[in-house]
Structures are given as C-alpha cells and as structure tokens.
Amino acid sequence: MKALSKLKAEEGIWMTDVPVPELGHNDLLIKIRKTAICGTDVHIYNWDEWSQKTIPVPMVVGHEYVGEVVGIGQEVKGFKIGDRVSGEGHITCGHCRNCRGGRTHLCRNTIGVGVNRPGCFAEYLVIPAFNAFKIPDNISDDLASIFDPFGNAVHTALSFDLVGEDVLVSGAGPIGIMAAAVAKHVGARNVVITDVNEYRLELARKMGITRAVNVAKENLNDVMTELGMTEGFDVGLEMSGAPPAFRTMLDTMNHGGRIAMLGIPPSDMSIDWTKVIFKGLFIKGIYGREMFETWYKMAALIQSGLDLSPIITHRFSIDDFQKGFDAMRSGQSGKVILSWD
C-alpha cells in the first residue's frame, strides 16, 4: 500500500510502498479517507532533537485521520464494516493504576500512533478497536480528520468552568484558535488570543474570537482596558510553549486564576513564582484527550453549532503531500488536509 514514511534520519518524509498492516483479534482495519498534518509531523519532517530521540526509522507516520472500517478482529464488538471512524492516537496499557482507575489519558505507558508505532499516513491503518470513535453522520470527513488536535483544544478549554469568564489564550496555532473558539462557544465573556503571526491571528478573527492581539504591535493591558476588564483574566490557556507568552499570562491573571498548559516550554524556562504563589494561581498540565469524554464533547460541540471550517485552509491530494508540508512549515496555514481517495 501507498504510505508516507520517515525513511532516513534526516530532514524529509518520503512516499513509499509498505505491506498492509496485519489485523489482530482486538483490532480494526481502517481504510483511510483523509488525514491532517500535525505540528508533530512537522517536527518529524524537520528531524529535530525530539524526533531524533523518539521516532524509529523507518516508520509510517501520521496520527490525524478519518476512514472506514474494512476489517474487524474476531474479538471485537460494537463495530461493523463500513463504519466511519477516527481514533484516539494514544494507545494505553490497560493495567497501570490510571488505566484501571478509568483515567486512561494519564497512562504512564502510552504509545503514540505515528510516533512510537506505524501511523495513519497510509492507505490502511490498524488500531485497537478500543481506540476507535464512530463519527456521527452529520460531521464531515474534513472535520473528523482533525478530531485529534480538536480534542487537545477541547480538553484544554474545558478544564475549567468558562461561563461568564474572561479567557486568555496564548498561541494562535490551530489548536489555540480552536480552544479559543470552544471557550467562546460555551459561554466565556471575553476571549483574547495572542501571537505574533498575523496570518494566524486573522484566522482567529474569522473564528469569531473577541480579540486577536499581535503582542509585537499591541499592549495586552491596553486591550484589557478596551474590553472593560478591571481585575485580570479568570482562565488562561497556554498553547504556545513560548516563555514570554507564559510570563505575560502570569502578569495578567486575576487572583485565584486557573491556567491549563498544553504548550511545551523549554525545560529550563524561568518564571516569577511569587506571582503563582501570591495570586493563588492553579496550573494544570494537559496531554492529549480524556478517553473518551473529550471525544463525545467534540462531536456535541460541532453538532450544537461550533463552526471549525475556517481553521482548514489547505487541501491536497496525497500525491501532493510535499505541498502540504511546505504550507505547514511556512507558518502561513491553518490545518492542512491530505485526501487519500
């Protein structure tokens, strides 16, 4: 079958031919319809320090997808041939304390699809049936293919009560923009997103965010005054991993504020901890999606009118995958979809 693989320990991803994966007793075989390129895939393409330590070579990559069930393991129940599915990219062990306690998103033995084992940038994918999620008929293939990153946004945004709150989102990548849109959709008062990338800030404006702020040109405190805010942000969603953005968030949080962190900062990032202590801030780390509460919330948000369509900016045939990666690497894109049909 046709697949995109990391074939060499150097920059790039290559089209290759690999065997169709074998179906296990508890697995589903999925014929891929559409995939989306993640920031993680760009890291793998660039072959940065993290990728060099993490990614086995050669391996099929990719973990954002939608497809159709074409094979079912003999122990699997609840699925049928033809079901349209996406899937949770974190494969968990099932026997650690968190897995047995129903907190599978906190599994200490997580294996990543397209990171630690073969991924979805291929005509067919095999995953455990436990990880598959049926897509409702009224959700398009394009939107279903980005459920993985949308799930990161939903998990982060819904970590705290947002109704009537003022929310700061730092980082206007696709996940940050989707998190801001979720916050607005579920009843936040003011949702402010910050970045220095004007293309992506404009995408945020198209998504109906209260205010998209280029912090290289505008002062966040001035924006807060403009919005009539007098006590700081109630909730912070840190999506950038940029130390200056996190420091600004700490500066502008209200006392008792709550921060969810999805962005990965440098390991040696320094902050003024007195602001955390004396403001009584609560900081929560976010990794992946809650299984499968986040997935049900994703479907419900779209079905209740959340419009994510502006975040998908580029669509290519899989044979033009290089154009897709070029768009993602340029920073001048939202989500990029690759069609396998």
Swiss-Prot record:
Cofactor: binding comment: Binds 2 Zn(2+) ions per subunit.
PROSITE patterns found in the cross-reference section: ADH_ZINC (PS00059)
Binding site residues for Zn(2+) 2: C93, C96, C99, C107
GO BP terms: L-threonine catabolic process to glycine
MF annotations from Gene Ontology: L-threonine 3-dehydrogenase activity; zinc ion binding
Keyword Zinc-finger: no
UniProt binding sites for NAD(+): I175, D195, R200, L262, G263, I264, I286, Y287
Alphabetical list of NCBIfam families matching this protein: PRK05396.1 (NF003808), tdh (TIGR00692)
Protein name: L-threonine 3-dehydrogenase
Source species: Escherichia coli O1:K1 / APEC
